[in-house]
Curated annotation (Swiss-Prot):
Keyword Zinc: yes
Keyword Nucleotidyltransferase tagged: yes
Cofactor(s) listed: Zn(2+)
Organismal lineage: Bacteria, Bacillati, Cyanobacteriota, Cyanophyceae, Synechococcales
Protein name: DNA-directed RNA polymerase subunit beta'
Residues binding Zn(2+): C248, C315, C322, C325
Keywords (A to Z) from UniProt: DNA-directed RNA polymerase, Metal-binding, Nucleotidyltransferase, Transcription, Transferase, Zinc
Catalytic activity: RNA(n) + a ribonucleoside 5'-triphosphate = RNA(n+1) + diphosphate
Length: 1363
């Protein structure tokens, strides 16, 4: 049975299948004719066609067997022929050296014209890259030719050529050249890899090569993730598109136009929407004809220009697509079944090739525009432009001056001799390389014809021009620089015209900031002469100290102010914590130094602190200020509070233990009296006796406080209330309660203990704080004109009134500190702390505080390139005393080589910072044989004539002309393009490596700047591009108005009803229309990416003025849909991926199915609501019947993410993104989910409504079968119906003998057969195909009633399936 294929399967693949189908008659008996014999090379494409043909004619089983045999065949012959690759198979073509040589020559020429300032840096770069790209292409051709002619059976060549593995670009890298690589930013490196993998790469090339390779790997890794996410979004948006109807009956359709008279695969698998009539009037197909490849070919033969077909885009089935609009299911080339989940198939078809797309965004700096549409002259003659010709000067990206046509016209070349003139059609935007009336030779490039009206969009890019030699800048007058002030008020200079900027050679010296030139402009200088001098002076004066030299500079210190503490001895002692320095006064008081000698301190910092134990407490406690004690308010308590006025400080000791452990470790109770040394918590002991207070929170012990004192039980309510809370100070002799009094001052508090309430009398310690710190006289040092220096003592309290000090150990209550005071205007002045021996007793060290002024003096430098030689002289000696403003050192800048000094004019705000010496080698005197033809001040480049027949061999400016010689000042020209930013002014001096200008150039935005996956995503998510093009809102005629300052342009469109709309064009935008051109709605007025939302709006607004709302919406959406489908297809096609249109259409249908309600009219809709177009249509129809006001709406385009979140099913939306938001909204709005899609059903665990779970599936089976009795219901022991038989081909059997239900039955007799036939109305001619009956084991056996013709007949009618 395998060889009798099923229902003729139609193949969308190759032409062979088509031929086979066409050659066989339509109603052929199966496989009676032998298959046609084909003898040709079967490469990858042929193999595809062969398998497709086998599948179409012979079904799956036969095809898979054949494929297996083909595989074995391939392996067998490959083994016999021993096809393998060795190094010797990689044959490098002979032509390679030659091609590389030509490229090198071209590039040398380009570099030369750059050096001569004929082209700009940008044009050079573009030209170099284009040259290499072209060389690479030519090399590929050479490789192909080499293999084809010399070694067609080469393993590498066969492999790549047959499509088994690899492609031409890989072969190119193996035996051609690796070519240009991009750096990680996507810019092309203009150093190509000239070698291939066979020859091996040099080190440089290897590094550049790995650049590109790394990028490829990273790309692939990112691509898989991106592509997966894209697929997920697509599945989510289209998962509920299921084929639910047979025919929606719509009259709408889409038009598929032939491209170059061919349809390719674009019609295959679609159904026609109208009659298709050929050019001669013959009807080729009726409505709803399935188009298979042969029919598509017939359309092409009959020259049908466009076919209207049904499409998912226009299908009117509710919430789904119907079979007729969808067409073939491409898996088995027949009309799609009901219940097929076409949405998911579409999503996967678009998402799966995602991994094959590139992620690249290339910034090529002008893509190779090498030889597009170049027209050469065929004869010698004179060029004539037509009468209506309009051209404007244009400079090509390679720096060639040409003219660009502004209108379409004809160019003729009138022959100089006999012959027919050559006519060339010039289109708008084409480039002309000849002038009107110019005489030209044959085979000269005349023009480059622009491809159609594709004005490529351009973007602005910049490139720096870097100076190659030091010298003086001089502009060509042609540049016409102008000042431009931007919004921030910065002034920049811009070139207005194309021109050269010269740098005339010379030795440029950078002067230090405070140097002044000592030579005059134009003076002749000799080597070693002083050009400029800089001096360094002291600000305050003082004693000089010279330090050793460090590196290339030397420090001179000037002691401005010094102060020695004569009354103190300085003593250092070492401890384990480092060195501690003490100051000891004559009376024995000691201060601890806070800094160490040799360090620097600032004003207000603490120098030393008094060592004083009088104010140290035993434990923590409470601070109380007695009246009279006052402190300064301080911003931060870090350094304590300064005492304003002395007095008494009261201290109530208490011991605080911070614990922060579990409560179970507590060993005492709250309120208990404990003795000193009691363990309160494991391993923590009390230092004093007293009453314990325990603080706890959440079963964690926070603190334990021990308050010492004497405790008295007390029942007197009044007394207890008086001392409640914080407690009260009680002076000696004051009564406290009955029987309780005190001799000293106490602090009384009420406490609760396990024994009962009582009063705790806590001891109070008194500390007397003096008004001023008692310190020896420190004195101040005052300078008449320098900074002052002094020390002052201050007392600082560590705590403020009522502060509780939580501590177990004691604390310092009062600190006495020595602080530094500089009374000076310079806050940043630092003071050095030094230890100096006493002048009288050398063994005793004293503390000295000095203020130093430090000056760095540069050493002599032997000529470094930019400063020239410098020579520095110190004017002072060690220990010398100087006054303020005296010079300490002078630096002289010496001339390196003799010459003539020049310098720019000095102005008040701009002192001279550079000067230039014009050396002998910067000029060149050339003797001429005849009178020179140049004038002084003229600028010459290589090749220009100095005198008759004497070209110059260098660039420069003419300085002197004699009758027999010319003196040139050498220089280097740089071409700058219009609108470039000039970084230097005319006459400025520049060093080598300085930036001269920033070239602003336009580079073609190639369509693939955003290509591959990011572009697909951009389209499907309907992203709004950043700088989108300006679109025309209404059709009309264009008028272009230039603004007065040449900057802003306005495009006005005069519409049909004489209304005028103005479109102001921003700076830097190119206008894409010309004057008096007719434009339609949605047409581009400027270049740039299109905003699809805006486009839809333009279409809708325009149509709405002419058509009813519903039609306008549908037509606007249809236009946008067509555009989206084409754009997406273009991306995939550019990568060589073929996807059937219908898949993209299913997705686009989902993106454009909604409209936004603008005005609800009398309907129940809400303004701003997104709703399906169909629903609004139904609602508005109801309104027109009842006479209510219909709803107004505008169509919207939703990106796939937005569309997924806006589906009717909230379960599906919530499972996609923003779960909480979707569910909350659904709950608030009380939404119901009708479970129409697949996802919803999967999530709640039901059968999905597609395939066999499709609700219409059962009914469809029954409807096909017609009414019939169920045999089993009549007679359980009789024959059963087999699955693959149509119900009406079932045999009724006589009942089994009553005794045995499982008896083996005899074959039915003729009479039985006759009876069954008559009962079911089956004509007598037809035999039964098959029947089944239970045998002894009650298992069904299938038997054939042998009648081959009947079987084939049934199969032909499609009533029997393969099995």
């Amino acid at each position: 049975m395998t060889s009798t294929p099923s229902k003729s399967r139609k193949s969308s693949k190759g032409s062979k299948a088509a031929k086979a189908a066409a050659s066989a008659p339509e109603t052929r008996p199966l496989a009676k004719t032998p298959p046609p014999f084909r003898n040709r090379v079967v490469d990858k494409k042929g193999l595809k066609q062969l398998v497709a043909w086998a599948y179409k004619h012979h079904g799956t089983a036969a095809t898979s067997a054949m494929a297996d045999q083909l595989k074995d065949l391939g392996f067998r012959y490959a083994t016999q022929a021993a096809v393998s690759i060795s190094v010797n198979d990689l044959k490098v073509p002979e032509a390679k050296q030659n091609l590389l040589g030509q490229a090198e020559e071209l590039i040398t020429a380009t570099e030369e014209s750059y050096r001569l300032g004929v082209i700009t840096e940008v044009e050079r770069h573009t030209k170099v890259i284009d040259t290499w790209t072209e060389t690479n292409e030519r090399l590929v051709d050479a490789v192909k030719k080499n293999f084809n002619q010399n070694d067609p059976l080469n393993s590498v060549w066969m492999m790549a050529n047959s499509g088994a593995r690899g492609n031409m670009s890989q072969v190119r890298q193996l035996v051609g050249m690796r070519g240009l690589m991009a750096n990680p930013q996507g810019e092309i490196i203009d150093l190509p890899i000239r070698t291939n993998f066979r020859e091996g790469l040099t080190v440089t090339e290897y590094v550049i090569s790995s650049y590109g390779a790394r990028k490829g790997l990273v790309d692939t890794a990112l691509r898989t993730a991106d592509s997966g996410y894209l697929t997920r979004r697509l599945v989510d948006v289209a998962q509920d598109v299921i084929v639910r109807e047979d025919d929606c009956g719509t009259s709408r359709c889409i038009l598929v136009k032939a491209e170059d008279g061919k349809y390719g695969n674009r019609l295959v698998g679609r159904l026609t929407a109208d009659q298709v009539v050929g050019a001669d009037g013959e009807v080729l197909a009726e409505r709803n004809t399935e188009i298979d490849p042969p029919l598509s070919k017939r359309f092409e033969k009959a020259a049908v220009q466009a076919v209207s077909v049904r499409s998912p885009l226009t299908c009117e089935a509710n919430r789904s697509v119907c079979r007729k609009c969808y067409g073939w299911a491409l898996a088995h080339n027949e009309l799609v079944d009901l219940g097929e989940a076409v949405g998911i198939i579409a999503a996967q078809s678009i998402g799966e090739p995602g991994t094959q797309l590139t992620m690249r965004t290339f910034h090529t700096g002008g893509v190779s525009t090498a030889e597009t549409g170049v027209v050469r002259s065929k004869l010698e003659g004179t060029v004539e432009f037509g009468a209506k010709a309009r051209v404007r000067p244009y400079r090509t990206p390679h720096g060639v001056n040409a003219q660009q046509a502004e209108v379409d016209f004809n160019l003729t070349i009138q022959p100089s001799g006999k012959g027919k003139p050559q006519k060339i059609e010039i289109t708008n935007g084409s480039l002309l390389f000849v002038d009107n009336g110019q005489a030209i030779d044959a085979d000269v490039t005349v023009a480059q014809i622009a491809a159609g009206a594709v004005k490529k969009s351009v973007e602005k890019a910049t490139k720096d021009v870097i100076c190659d030699l030091a010298g003086q800048v001089s502009y060509d007058p042609s540049i016409q620089p102008r000042e431009v002030t931007d919004r921030q008020g910065n002034i920049t200079h811009k070139a207005q015209r194309l021109g050269r900027m010269w740098v005339l050679a010379g030795d440029v010296y950078n002067l230090p900031p405070n140097a002044r030139p000592v030579v005059t402009a134009g003076a002749t200088v000799t080597e070693g002469q002083v050009l400029a001098e800089a001096s360094q002076a002291s600000e305050y004066g003082g004693a000089i100290r010279l330090r050793e030299a460090l590196g290339d500079s030397r420090e001179v210190q000037i002691v401005t102010t010094a102060m020695t503490l004569r009354d103190f001895k300085l003593q250092g002692e070492s401890t384990h914590a480092g060195e501690i320095w003490n100051l000891e006064a004559k009376d024995g008081t000691r201060y601890r130094l806070n800094t160490i000698p040799g360090s620097k301190i600032g004003s207000g910092e603490v120098v030393a602190e008094l060592n004083d134990d009088r104010f140290r407490t035993q434990t923590g406690g409470l601070v109380r200020f007695a009246p009279g004690l006052a402190i300064k308010k301080a911003r931060s308590a870090k350094n304590g509070y300064e005492v304003n006025k002395g007095g008494t400080l009261l201290w109530i000791p208490q011991e605080t233990h911070e614990i922060n452990k579990d409560i179970s470790l507590l060993m005492i109770t709250d309120g208990q009296w404990i003795e000193a040394g009691t363990e309160v918590v494991k391993d923590i002991f009390s230092q004093t006796a007293g009453i314990v207070t325990v603080t706890q929170k959440n079963d964690i012990l926070r603190e334990i406080i021990v308050r010492s004192g004497s405790f008295h039980l007390c029942t007197e309510k009044k007394a207890l209330e008086r001392f409640q809370g914080d407690g009260v100070m009680v002076n000696p002799g004051e009564p406290i309660a009955k029987g309780i009094s005190t001799e000293t001052m106490v602090y009384v508090q009420t406490v609760e203990t396990p024994e009962g309430s009582g009063l705790l009398l806590r001891p109070v310690e008194e500390y007397t704080i003096p008004n001023e710190a008692q310190l020896p006289d420190l004195g101040h040092v005052k300078q008449p004109n320098g900074p002052h220096l002094g020390l002052k003592a201050s007392q600082r309290l560590a705590f403020k009134d009522n502060e509780l000090v939580k501590s177990v150990e004691g604390v310092e209550l009062l600190r006495t500190q020595l602080m530094l005071e500089t009374f000076d205007t310079t806050p940043q002045m630092t003071v050095d702390v030094e230890a100096v021996p006493d002048k009288r007793a050398k063994t005793i060290e004293r503390l000295q505080l000095v203020i130093l002024e430090s000056i760095l003096v540069r050493r002599d430098t032997i000529s470094d390139s930019s400063h020239g030689s410098t020579h520095t002289e110190l004017q002072v000696e060690d220990g010398q005393s100087i006054k303020a403003g005296e010079v300490i050192a002078t630096t002289q800048i010496l001339c390196k080589q003799e010459g003539v000094a020049q310098m720019p004019e000095a102005t008040a705000d701009e002192p001279v910072r550079r000067l230039i010496v014009e050396r002998p080698e910067d000029t060149l005197t050339i003797s001429t044989n005849s009178q020179p033809v140049v004038t002084v001040g003229q600028r010459i480049v290589d090749g220009e004539e100095l005198a008759a027949g004497q070209p110059s061999d260098c660039c420069g400016e003419v300085e002197k002309v004699d009758s027999t010689s010319v003196t040139l000042r050498l220089g280097r020209p740089y071409m700058v393009s219009p609108d470039s930013l000039l970084h230097v002014r005319d006459g400025d001096l520049v060093q080598r490596g300085d930036g001269l200008a920033l070239l602003v150039f336009e580079r073609q935005k190639t369509g693939d700047i955003v290509q591959g996956l990011p572009r697909i995503e951009e389209l499907l998510e309907a992203r709004r591009p950043r700088e989108s093009a300006i679109l025309c809102k209404k059709p009309g005629t264009v008028e272009i108005k230039q603004g007065e300052d040449d900057e802003n342009t306005t495009v006005t469109v005069i519409e049909a009803d004489d209304a005028v709309s103005e479109y102001p064009i921003l700076l830097g935008r190119n206008v894409m229309v010309s004057d008096s051109q007719q434009v339609t709605a949605g047409e581009l007025l400027t270049d740039g990416p299109i905003n699809p939302h805006e486009l839809l709006e333009c279409f809708f607004e325009d149509l709405r003025s002419r058509k009813p709302l519903m039609d306008a919406a549908q037509e606007a959406i249809a236009k946008l849909q067509h555009r989206l489908v084409t754009e997406v297809q273009n991306v995939y096609k550019s990568q060589g991926v073929s996807i059937d249109d219908k898949h993209i259409e299913v997705i686009v249908r989902q993106m454009t199915s909604k409209v936004r309600v603008e005005d609800a009219g009398d309907t129940t809709l809400l303004p701003g609501e997104l709703i399906e177009l169909r629903q609004v249509e139904d609602t508005n129809q109801a309104m027109s019947i009842t006479g209510g006001a219909p709803a107004e709406f505008t169509p919207v385009l939703l990106g796939i993410t937005k569309a997924s979140l806006n589906t009717d099913s909230f379960i599906s939306a919530a499972s996609f993104q923003e779960t909480t938001r979707v569910l909350t909204e659904a709950a608030i709005e009380g939404k119901s989910d009708w479970l129409r899609g697949l996802k919803e059903n999967v999530i709640i665990g039901r059968l999905i409504p597609a395939g066999t779970g499709f609700s219409g599936f059962e009914e469809e089976l029954k409807a096909e079968a017609g009414p019939h009795p169920d045999i089993l219901a009549e007679d359980p022991a009789g024959y059963r119906r087999m699955q693959n038989l149509r119900p009406d081909y079932t045999v009724d059997m006589p009942a089994a003998p009553a005794g045995d239900a499982t008896a083996v039955l005899d074959d039915p007799s003729d009479a039985d057969m006759e009876a069954t036939r008559s009962r079911h109305g089956i004509e007598a001619g037809s035999n039964f195909a098959a029947f089944a009956r239970p045998d002894a084991d009650n298992e069904l056996k299938e038997e054939q009633v042998v009648d081959a013709e009947a079987v084939e007949g049934l199969q032909e009618e499609g009533l029997l399936s393969d099995e």
